[in-house]
Amino acid sequence: MAIGEVYETYDAVGLAELVQRREVTPKELLDEALARVEALNPQLNAVVMLEEGVARRLIEEGLPEGPLKGVPFLLKDLGAEAIDFPSNNGSRLFANTRYGKDSSIYARLKAAGLVTFGRTTSPEGGVGPTTEAAVYGGPTRNPWNLDHTSGGSSGGAGAAVAAGIIPAAHGSDGGGSVRIPASSCGLFGFKATRARLPDGPYVGEGWAGMAIDGFLTRSVRDTAVLLDATHGPDLGAPYVAPPLEGTFLGALAPCERRLRVGFATTTLTGEPIHPECRAAVEKAARLLESFGHIVEEALPHADTPGMMAAWTKIVACGSALSLDGTVRRRGRPLEEGEVEPIALSAAAYGRTISGAEYLESINKVHAYGREMAAFFERYDILLTATLAEPPALIGRFNHTSDDYVDYRMGPGRVFAYSPFTAAFNASGQPAASVPLHWTADGLPVGIHLAAAYGHDEMLLGLCARFEEAAPWFQRRPPVTLQAVRS
C-alpha cells in the first residue's frame, strides 16, 4: 500500500487497524508523518521539538499491543511531561525543560501504542485563544486560511491535525484550549468531566481543577478510544470523577433516549454573536429536533461575569507561582525578553491577590458550578456556539499587551471572543466543540454542547449522532500535503 496516497482518508483507529492487518508498518506511518511536517510546517509553524530518533527507537524496541499501535502522535508543548520529550511550555523561560519521570497521561498514551515524535505549539503559559508564542519565532497559522489563527492554547495540535500531519493530537483545556482550536480548525474537541483524566505526578490539579488534558481529532471515535486509553485517577489523585457506566467507545452506539435541550443564540449573558455563529447554532438546533429531542431556547441563571473575574484571578496566581518559582530555583532574576508582556502582567496581577482573595475566587467558581447544575436539573444539554466569532485574524490576541485583566475581560478581548468555553472549566462539566458549519469564506465554526457533571458518555454519544447526520471527516482545508504538492 502506498500510504501517502490514503493517509488522510483514515482516522487514528483506521490507521491502527491497517497496522494490525499488516497492510502498513509503524515505520511507514512515521515516515509519512515526518514528510508531512517537512512539507507543511513551514506554512503552519505548528510542530516543534521533533524527536525522530526517540520515535524510531520506540518502534524498534517493540510497541505495546494497544488500541492505537503504530499511529504517529504529537504532544502539546505544555504539560504532558515525558522523559524523552523536553518542552518549552510555550516560553523562552522554560525552553528545553527536561523531565525525570513520565507524566501519567503520557505513560497511558505510550501504553496505547502511539508513536510520539514531537510536540505542538502553545502560547506562553497556555493563556490565550491563539498561539503566537515568541519562543517559536512566529504565530501558528490556520490551514483553512493562513491569515487566521488556529486557536489556542492547543493551537499547534489543531493546525497539525487539520492539515493532515497526524490524525489526532494531545491537547489540554483550562478555559477552552481544546475546544477553541477544534472550532477554529474544523475538528472535534472534547473536554471531559473534571478529574476524568490524570494530572499527576507533577501537579495535583491544574488551575484549581479547571484545567484537564484532552485531544484534537477528526473523528469522534478517535476521541473515544483515546479517552478509554487514558481516563481514570492516577496514584494519589486528590479527587476522582464519577464512574463511567461503560466505555467511551461503547457510548457511541445509538441511544433512543429523548433529550431535553436548551439552546442560546447569544452569549451566556445575552449579548449577540456573529451571524455565522448564530447560523451554526440554529442548524444544530434543527438537527437535534430531527433526532427527536425536545429543543427550546434557554439560558442558565448563573453569574458568568463573576466566574470570569474569578477565573482570571486564579490563572494569574498560577502565572505568579510559575514565574516566581522558576526564578527562585535558578537563583537569578528574569532577563529582558525571557517572558512575554502578558505573562509578566498576569504574574504581577497574581502577586496582588491575597490568599483570602484566592480562596474567595475558588469559592466563586464552585458556586458557579452549582448555579450551572441547577440548569441541568431541567435540561440534559446546553447548545451554544463555541466562539462568538469565526477564527480571529493573526495578531489580535498576541501577548504584547501589558494589561492582563483587560486582555481577558476588556471589550472585544478574550472573554468576549470566547464567552462560552471557560464556563465549563469552572463548573467541571463535560463539553465539546463539534465542527458543524463553515462560513461563506470557508472558515470553520463549531457548535458547543455541554452536559451535566459526569455525563460524559451521553454527551459523546450525542456528538457521534451529529457526526453521522452531518459528516465532516472528508472536508479538507486548502493547506494539505496534496495542495502543497499539486
Model-derived segments and spans:
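Short, surface-exposed loop/helix-turn segments at secondary-structure junctions
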Residues: 240-243, 392-418
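Acyltransferase
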Residues: 23-31, 60, 247-250, 273-300, ...
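An N-terminal boundary/leader segment
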Residues: 1-50, 290-292, 352, 441, ...
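A short helix-breaking turn/cap at a secondary-structure junction
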Residues: 191-284, 302, 470-486
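Short helix-loop capping/hinge segments that flank enzyme active sites or metal/cofactor-binding pockets
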Residues: 3, 68-89, 253-265, 314-373, ...
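Acidic/His- and Gly-rich active-site-bordering loop/insert found
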Residues: 55-134
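Short glycine/serine-rich loop segments
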Residues: 99-234, 425-446
